[in-house]
Design a protein with these regions (language model features):
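A conserved regulatory-domain signal marking ACT and ACT-like small-molecule sensing domains
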Residues: 4-5, 14-199
């Protein structure tokens, strides 16, 4: 009888296990030591598992985004616990779609030029007008090797759920180069790489 009871316990445990779903949790605020530890401890205490994360600091401000897997009924409590763990920071959470559709088009975008006002706005406006979205974007400004001019660079990944006329897009970027006096490089990913970019 004891053996039968023990054998049934794992089955009972499986039957009561909560369904899992994914949540994107973002934390933004002043950088300080132990911040990541405080956030991840709060998540773990609510049986959350950090599947993927990305963090960076700009000046004194720290930003972190995490894809968290947790019980579907734990999302509100988990978000509240993270906010309590870092009361001086802005915490937001959004339900994540479990299935990300593979894009029909994906390409890397690199822009470099002398720094100037409105560069990011103009480039991203062109990308949006072409029906593309930017899944990743990084910009920076640094001094030229021999001093004087500030150099600007932008790197990103463009995605589209629809097929794109690559020749037309390339011509558009060439026109933008001439208009703005910038260097623009576009590298189209193959299908396998496109799936990775969307993940």
């Amino acid at each position: 009888k004891m053996l039968a009871t023990r054998a049934l316990r794992p089955l009972a445990s499986l039957a009561t296990r909560r369904p899992l779903s994914q949540l994107v949790v973002s934390v933004v605020g002043p950088d300080r030591g132990g911040l990541v530890s405080s956030v991840t401890r709060a998540i773990a205490q609510h049986d959350g598992n950090v599947v993927e994360s990305s963090s960076f600091s700009i000046g004194p401000v720290f930003s972190m985004a995490m894809l968290v897997e947790a019980g579907a009924d734990q999302h509100a409590a988990l978000t509240s616990a993270v906010q309590s763990a870092v009361p001086g920071h802005s915490v937001s959470a959004h339900e994540a779609e479990e299935c990300v559709e593979a894009p029909a088009f994906a390409a890397a975008l690199d822009v470099s030029c002398a720094d100037g006002v409105g560069l990011i706005a103009r480039v991203t406006e062109f990308v949006a007008n072409e029906g593309l979205s930017l899944s990743k974007l990084e910009t920076k400004t640094e001094g030229a090797p021999h001093g004087g001019t500030q150099l600007f660079s932008l790197s990103g990944v463009m995605l589209s759920k629809d097929r794109v006329n690559e020749a037309k897009l390339a011509r558009g970027f060439k026109d933008l180069e001439l208009e703005m006096g910038v260097n623009i490089d576009m590298c189209v990913y193959d299908d396998a790489e496109a799936v990775k970019m969307a993940a």
